[in-house]
Structure formats: C-alpha cells, structure tokens
C-alpha cells in the first residue's frame, strides 16, 4: 500500500466539503460522483473520535474520577487511531462518492450527501462503527455520538458495499455497510428501538463540553 495519507486525506476532504456545500461534488479523475438508488452506504473509520479527544482535554478530571487508567488508555488509543488509506483508494471507481464526517457527526454527513443529490437514504444507527469507550464517555457527558465530530472517518457510497467494507477491513480500518441509497427523498433511520426520519443537522455535541 502507499504510505498513510490520513492527515492529507482529512485536509483534502475537509476542503472539498467546504467547497461544495449542498451541491453535487465535482472531483477528479472521474468527474461528478454518483449517488443512485440501490447503492450501499459504507462507513470507514469509527465515529466520535475528535469529540472523545476534546472530552479528554476539557474534562480530564471528570474522566479520571469516573474511569480507571486502563480504560482511559484504551479510549486514547481508539480516539487517536488514524484512518490509514492510500490516496488511490479514493480514485477507485468502486467508490462513487464520499463525505468526510466532521462537524455535526455522521448524521450531518448523511444529511449533506443525500441532500446534495436530492436522493433518499435508509440506514441503521446500530450498524455504524463506534467504540465502547467512546459510547461510555458520551453517556457520562450526555452526548449523542452520532452528532459528535469524528475526524478520521468517511462516509462512502458504492455499488458493492460489502466488498468495499471487506477491503477496508483488510487495510486495518473499521468498516461497515450501514444502509442504502433509496428512491424518493426520505431519509429513513432505524435503530435504538425505533424507526423514524433523519432530522436537519444539529449543533455539534462537542459544544456541550464547554
């Protein structure tokens, strides 16, 4: 594999995200991306990492009072784990579109990418990769991990999502197929004991940390 490009990847995708807003994404070398019914939604990386690091910085004493040092070491390791993918991976025709998971978390990324193409989606919260350590930190500070900035996490679209997820796992990345692109414009969400529709992006949960 080519050298890890996690930092360059984050910079590139962040720049791309800011440039396109809610419009279709223009990218090279394949031109405009593709986001059509029947395709799979794949998450590469674990959500909530940047938020967990912010908690470790801003709420260090509260974390040390609640959790054992071994737990905090695992949390730090999980939060700092880089998404190491070669640049060529994002130029592969098998990845027809992507959205970097940043402010507002995975739910904002799902809203943005579906809105850019005015296309419906369905997905399960329970299938989205998140570490147990990050979940416990979110519970302590009453944070929604799905609306927490992630960093090192990308939402991808593919015709063959299961194959894509397997390739990602072979590269050492957490990966899961979480849903599909659907006909219509509804954004259907399941998991956590209920079925509903995705709401507009909310302020990032990291703001609750002060």
Q: What feature does the model see in each segment?
A:
Residues 53-75:
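Short, compositionally biased
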Residues 1-53, 180:
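Glycine-rich anion-binding loops of enzyme active sites
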Residues 57-62, 111-118, 139-141, 166-174:
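Short, solvent-exposed amphipathic alpha-helical segments in soluble enzyme
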Residues 75-149:
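Active-site-proximal betaalpha loop/short-helix elements
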Residues 4, 32-36, 89-92, 115, ...:
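Solvent-exposed alpha-helices and their adjacent loops that cap or buttress functional pockets
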Residues 157-163:
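Helix N-cap motif at beta-to-alpha junctions
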Residues 171-210:
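Acidic, Ser/Thr/Pro-rich beta/coil linker or hinge segments at domain junctions
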């Amino acid at each position: 594999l080519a050298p890890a490009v996690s930092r360059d990847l984050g910079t590139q995708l962040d720049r791309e995200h800011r440039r396109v807003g809610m419009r279709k994404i223009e990218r090279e070398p394949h031109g405009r991306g593709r986001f059509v019914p029947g395709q799979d939604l794949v998450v590469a990386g674990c959500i909530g990492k940047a938020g967990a690091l912010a908690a470790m910085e801003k709420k260090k004493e509260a974390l040390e009072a609640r959790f054992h040092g071994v737990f905090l070491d695992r949390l730090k390791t999980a939060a700092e784990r880089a998404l190491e993918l070669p640049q060529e991976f994002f130029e592969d025709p098998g990845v027809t579109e992507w959205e970097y998971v940043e402010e507002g978390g995975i739910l904002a990324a799902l809203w943005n990418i579906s809105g850019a193409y005015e296309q419906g989606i369905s997905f399960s919260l329970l299938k989205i990769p998140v570490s147990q350590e990050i979940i416990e930190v979110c519970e302590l500070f009453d944070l929604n991990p799905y609306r927490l900035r992630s960093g090192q996490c990308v939402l991808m679209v593919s015709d063959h999502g299961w194959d894509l997820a397997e390739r990602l796992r072979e590269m050492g990345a957490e990966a899961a197929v979480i849903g599909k692109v659907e006909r219509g414009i509804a954004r259907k969400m399941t998991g956590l004991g209920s079925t509903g529709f995705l709401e507009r992006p909310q302020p990032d949960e990291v703001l609750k940390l002060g």
